[in-house]
Amino acid sequence: MKTRDMNRDWIATAATLNAALPYLQRYDDAIVVIKLGGHAMGSDEAMESFARDVVLLRQVGVNPVVVHGGGPMINAMLKKLDIQSEFVNGKRVTDVATVEVVEMVLSGVVNKRIVQEINRQGGKAVGLSGKDANLMICDQTNPDLGFVGTPTEMNPDLLRNLFAHDIIPVIAPLGAGREGETFNVNGDTAAGAIAAALKADRLLLLTDVSGVKNGEGEVLTELKAGQIREMIADGTIAGGMIPKTETALDALDNGVRAVVILDGRVDNAVLLELYTEHGAGSLIRRD
């Protein structure tokens, strides 16, 4: 005869699921674009946790899109191949040799690692880059920087077709040039452009910081676009947070409902953000 021990852990689990119900209903059939930064990928355990979160999103009716970076992995491969990098105003020049390494690492290593882990956790993921089906057509950002591109034309129909078949797109931030070039695209920029093209309900920028901070170093849990602009102007937002918040502003201006900057190294960060009252990072909305 079986017996049941209604211990506190089980009761807490049931209470958590019950509390999540309004959020499960809110995000049913929603499009959520998730940018997974190279520094947020961390260990195999962190990757497994992230993949489980993404699979769960799809299981409860969300249409997730993963856009990934890979800067640390690219740097390691360039060093291994003894390819020297030039910099202009602190930005790497992406020459022919470098863009070949970038594509090899992003599409051939990082992308497939994420795809494989999502599939191992029970999802159906497909690896793409912005070159596939002309998803992301780019113009050269600055001739001095070489093969660095800015998305100028988006074709997201392929992604919608994948949603219809419960497939999770995992996208490397590479764009197609109009003359057959391959362009390296900033990962945040690529994620923002894809989210805007899909009119996503959420753009989640997973990084290695806990969110946008005020002058006292405290994480701000919710901000309006105007506040972000003021904080950039007065220097409160500085350094690497500037391009992330600028991506957020561009995405909001182009139809994304809200953007969140959060620490992707935290276990279940995506679930905490979407399915709990207080979220997990800095939520940015339109004014």
From Swiss-Prot:
Pfam families: AA_kinase
Superkingdom of source: Bacteria
CDD domains given in the database record: AAK_NAGK-C
Signal peptide start-end: none
Annotated EC: 2.7.2.8
Described function: Catalyzes the ATP-dependent phosphorylation of N-acetyl-L-glutamate.
Predominant location category: cytoplasm
GO molecular function, one term: acetylglutamate kinase activity
Keywords (A to Z) from UniProt: Amino-acid biosynthesis, Arginine biosynthesis, ATP-binding, Cytoplasm, Kinase, Nucleotide-binding, Transferase
Family: Belongs to the acetylglutamate kinase family. ArgB subfamily.
GO cellular component: cytoplasm
Enzyme class: transferase
Gene Ontology biological-process annotations: arginine biosynthetic process via ornithine; L-arginine biosynthetic process
Name the UniProt record assigns to this protein: Acetylglutamate kinase
InterPro entries in UniProt: AceGlu_kinase-like_sf, AcgluKinase_fam, ArgB, Asp/Glu/Uridylate_kinase, Glu/AcGlu_kinase, NAGK-C
Site (Transition state stabilizer): 35, 244
SUPFAM superfamilies, A to Z: Carbamate kinase-like
Catalytic activity: N-acetyl-L-glutamate + ATP = N-acetyl-L-glutamyl 5-phosphate + ADP
Sites where the protein binds substrate: 70-71, 92, 184
PANTHER family, sorted: N-ACETYLGLUTAMATE SYNTHASE (PTHR23342), N-ACETYLGLUTAMATE SYNTHASE, MITOCHONDRIAL (PTHR23342:SF0)
